[in-house]
Amino acid sequence: MIILFRGHMRDNSTEHKTRRAASSKDVRPAELDEVDRRILSLLHGDARMPNNALADTVGIAPSTCHGRVRRLVDLGVIRGFYTDIDPVAVGLPLQAMISVNLQSSARGKIRSFIQQIRRKRQVMDVYFLAGADDFILHVAARDTEDLRSFVVENLNADADVAGTQTSLIFEHLRGAAPI
């Protein structure tokens, strides 16, 4: 199981709420028809697509399209509309994935670790994992010195962190919509 927590690479004036991921036993998949799937696919490609253009492309009335999108939001299928900020454009061209393992004695501090680490400006996403690693952090930094400082000051200096492993990202390609 992977739980994703968004970091603070986005506009600091907007508070992003953390969602607690439910297990597959807790959630029944929403009933989606082909129109819903086309709407989701189009919004995945461009979340700013105007409702009239979305309705026209899908072949339904704008009022029907608006109602469909609202229903998908209400059902939790659409969890939000986000700005995808290019780290390079804001001076953070080096990206990495950092695997983090906590000390076994720190298991009760998982939530506080998440809240503390996701506030760091370099952290784009936090993945809470089941498996060999406890977390994977997706981070962006100015350069290797900035990345090293982040790891040393925020992870290695934390007594609750047992170890880390850093992998540099050469290229990030967005996947297809999961529909």
Swiss-Prot record:
The keyword Transcription regulation applies. PROSITE patterns: HTH_ASNC_2 (PS50956). Residues 51-70 bind DNA. GO terms for biological process: response to amino acid. GO terms for cellular component: cytosol. Transcriptional regulator that might play a role under hypoxic conditions. Regulates the expression of ald, which encodes L-alanine dehydrogenase. Serves as both an activator for ald expression in the presence of L-alanine and a repressor in the absence of L-alanine. Acts by binding directly to the upstream region of the ald gene. Four AldR-binding sites (O2, O1, O4 and O3) were identified upstream of the ald gene. This is HTH-type transcriptional regulator AldR. It comes from Mycobacterium tuberculosis (strain ATCC 25618 / H37Rv). The lineage of its organism: Bacteria, Bacillati, Actinomycetota, Actinomycetes, Mycobacteriales.
